[in-house]
Every structure is written in C-alpha cells, then in structure tokens.
C-alpha cells in the first residue's frame, strides 16, 4: 500500500502515466535482458541464479517458471510471451533491500492484480505495464519469508488481451539465492 501511495501522491502528479510506464519498462527490462545475456551471473542455487551489477551496485536472484499454462474462455491457448521472470532485488543506493518483482512477459490487464500463491497462501501484487510488485516493503518481507519456507510459487494473472496465465516457479534454492544476493550487495 505504501508503494502505491507514494506513486499516487508524489510521482503521478509529476509525470504522465506513459512516462512512468516507459521508465519502469526501461529500468526493469535490464533485469530480464541480464537474465538472458549478462556475463554478471555470479552463482546458481538449484533453480535460482544470482546476478550482480556495479555502478550503481545491484544484486538480484531470479528464476524462470518450471510450468506455464495460458487459458482463454477456459481453454488452453498458445500465446507469445516475452521473458517470464521472478526476482528478488537489492539496490543499496536506493535502499531497496529485498524487493519482489515479477514480469509475465506481456502487459497485464489495467488495474488488475497478480495473485501469488505460495503453498496455499495467497498474496496480491499490484501491476503496472508488464511488471508486478508487492504493495509495501512489509509485504515484500512477508512474501519472501513464505517463499523461503515453500516448495513452489504459482503466479496467476490476466493479460490486457484477456488471457489468463499461470506460472509455476520452483523454490528450490530460493533461500540460498536470496541470501547470496543480499550478502553481495552489503
């Protein structure tokens, strides 16, 4: 809620929504690109990888889904999606210490939430363009704590075209990957 409040009260009046979307996409698309092409991958922890960038210092753990299901009107459909990634980010310069971020590889339906289910416990992530986040730093911490205890995370979302997606991520190596990324950014 705090992140949304900051956006609504401070950022929104300053710039247009299109500018914010462009900035978010540019900023976070570097993570997706780095997952595929970066030579800054420093470690693997089972199903999770750790990346580090310098200047400014950024560290993140990231994973791709093990299973993806796309449906429309209750039927499984084949759709083209970009990178589907789940991150935990650390950026000391910005005082970001464990921010959960998800990209589904498509623009989310406007005003929609992504449902994150960790072993039966549900969490709502707010969306902007192709990205989704927890609503506050406290929510980030609660979700990450649940993920450390869990076996899998299922993210369910709706695209701007009405496609329902369900992405299942393994949490094997999650705890070690997050700890490693955090340590590298201290």
Model-found features: residue ranges?
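Cleavable N-terminal signal peptides
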Residues: 21-22, 32
């Amino acid at each position: 809620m705090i992140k949304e409040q900051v956006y609504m009260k401070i950022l929104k009046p300053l710039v247009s929504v299109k500018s914010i979307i462009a900035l978010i996409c540019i900023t976070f698309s570097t993570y997706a690109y780095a997952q595929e092409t970066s030579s800054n991958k420093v470690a693997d922890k089972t199903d999770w990888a750790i990346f580090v960038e310098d200047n400014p210092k950024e560290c993140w753990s990231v994973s791709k889904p093990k299973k993806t299901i796309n449906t429309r009107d209750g039927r499984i459909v084949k759709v083209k999606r970009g990178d589907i990634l789940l991150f935990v980010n650390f950026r000391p310069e910005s005082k970001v210490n464990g921010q959960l971020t998800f990209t589904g590889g498509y623009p989310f339906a406007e005003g929609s939430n992504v449902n994150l289910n960790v072993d039966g416990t549900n969490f709502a992530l707010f969306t902007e363009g192709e990205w989704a986040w927890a609503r506050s730093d406290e929510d980030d911490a609660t979700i990450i704590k649940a993920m450390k205890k869990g076996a899998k995370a299922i993210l369910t979302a709706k695209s701007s075209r009405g496609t329902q997606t369900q992405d299942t991520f393994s949490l094997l190596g999650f705890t070690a990957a997050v700890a490693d990324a955090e340590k590298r950014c201290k």
